[in-house]
Amino acid sequence: MAGALEGIRILDLSWGIAGPLGVLLLAEQGADVIKVEPPGGDPFRVYDGYKVWTRSRRSVTCDLKSDAGVDAFRKLAATADMLVESLRPGA
């Protein structure tokens, strides 16, 4: 049985607990979630619950501080229906 969000692509730039848990609910409803991580990975990978919070999604590394990384992210964003982020203001 298809989920309610089947066919929806979400880019996940969130970190911590709240963002990934919110996106997890969307993924469990059938959304195609792609987690965009900085080089070196998400700093929250060290926590035991990380694999639970970020299940049901694919992951890519993208350096948003480089021109090549920004270009790659823009191409990826052009294919997405939604973007979830938890960046600090002005980032």
List PLM regions with ranges:
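N-terminal helix-loop segment corresponding to the beta1-alpha1 unit
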Residues: 1-91
